[in-house]
From Swiss-Prot:
Biological or metabolic pathway of the protein: Glycolipid biosynthesis; lipid IV(A) biosynthesis; lipid IV(A) from (3R)-3-hydroxytetradecanoyl-[acyl-carrier-protein] and UDP-N-acetyl-alpha-D-glucosamine: step 2/6
Binding residues annotated for Zn(2+), in chain numbering: H78, H235, D239
Chain segments annotated as coiled-coil in the UniProt record: none
GO terms of biological process kind: lipid A biosynthetic process
GO cellular component: membrane
Active site: H262
Keywords tagged on the record: Hydrolase, Lipid A biosynthesis, Lipid biosynthesis, Lipid metabolism, Metal-binding, Zinc
The protein's name in its UniProt record: UDP-3-O-acyl-N-acetylglucosamine deacetylase
One annotated GO molecular function: UDP-3-O-acyl-N-acetylglucosamine deacetylase activity
Species, as recorded: Citrifermentans bemidjiense (strain ATCC BAA-1014 / DSM 16622 / JCM 12645 / Bem) (Geobacter bemidjiensis)
């Protein structure tokens, strides 16, 4: 799809905030082409609007938080992943609290509601951010790189020193079908000892076995077990889709991440956006859409398929 899209109708959610433990209601509304994704804290007087963009990220501890002045909205990554995954470029997000509801810990409830609301196609072309040169950020043993590629792809190498998790690797070559079918339902996860520690410090107050995979000393303690054998790394890729959508554009490039999280994802997006020599923005015509690298991009021979 080369044209910008929004929702066909409204979609409303109500649920618990993972960290605040408070019930929050959120409504997605259609928006005009060129709007982007804009959150509105409607519980404040006057309401405060915050564009979902990397320049508005104010915190990446445990989740991704955007803010403006004293107002903020946290835990936006699952909703942002669902919007990107369903092809939604423009939407208003009315929210009556400081945190997006965690729902079941995945993007699946958001995807289902967006799918039910339908999609409206505009006549305005999308802008694709096409990576021209590699960009890398490193933090200790954590690393994230985005390199030129003919497609949008995320490859994630996850490593934990725990027998139930250990190392997991998976790649997503992005399409709406692959994201919705293979990644949207992967749930957030945490270690029991860390969850108990966070709750003692006033965090993760809404966390439960209903909205997260919890890992104890001997493995997953959720009675239903895992939705996928490698659900953990699938969820890390889901988070990455949401965090990387804060470029404000559809992406064409290959992200390679090792032990990355919200903070490093944000640093990668920020580093990319401040280096205009490393990317180009393209509005594709129908004729050019299937051959993006013929437009102002160097030789193709070294690019990944």
């Amino acid at each position: 799809m080369i044209f910008q899209q929004t929702l066909g109708n409204k979609a409303t959610f109500s649920g618990i905030g993972l960290h605040t433990g408070k019930t929050i209601t959120l409504t997605l509304r259609p928006a005009e082409a060129g709007t982007g994704i804009v959150f509105h804290r409607v519980d404040l007087a006057p309401a405060v609007s915050i564009e979902a963009h990397a320049s508005n990220v104010v915190n990446t501890r445990l989740s991704t938080t955007i803010g403006r002045g004293d107002a903020s909205v946290s835990t936006i990554e699952h909703l942002m992943a669902a919007l990107y995954g369903c092809g939604i470029d423009n939407a208003h997000v009315d929210i009556d609290g400081p945190e997006v509801p965690i729902m079941d810990g995945s993007a699946a409830p958001f995807v289902a509601a967006i799918t039910k609301a339908g999609v409206k196609v505009s006549g305005k072309a999308r802008k694709y951010l096409v990576v021209k040169k590699p960009v890398t950020v490193v933090d200790g043993d954590k690393k994230a790189t985005i390199i030129p590629s003919r497609h949008y792809k995320i490859s994630f190498d996850m490593q934990f020193a725990h027998p139930a998790v250990k190392s997991q690797f998976r790649s997503l070559e992005f399409s709406q079908e692959s994201f919705i079918g293979d990644f949207a339902a992967a749930r957030t996860f945490g270690f029991l000892a860390e969850v108990e520690m966070m709750k003692s410090h006033g965090l993760a107050l809404g966390g439960s076995l209903e909205n997260a995979v919890v890992i104890g000393d001997n493995g997953v303690i959720n009675p239903e077990g895992l939705r996928f054998q490698d659900e953990f790394v699938r969820h890390k890729i889901l988070d990455s889709v949401g965090d990387l959508s804060l470029t404000g554009h559809r992406l064409i490039g290959h992200v390679k991440a090792t032990k990355s999280g919200h903070d490093l994802n944000h640093k990668l997006v920020t580093e990319l956006l401040k280096r205009p020599d490393c990317y180009t923005l393209i509005e594709f015509t129908p004729q050019a859409f299937n051959a993006p690298f013929n437009i102002g991009i160097p030789e193709l021979s070294w690019l990944e398929a």
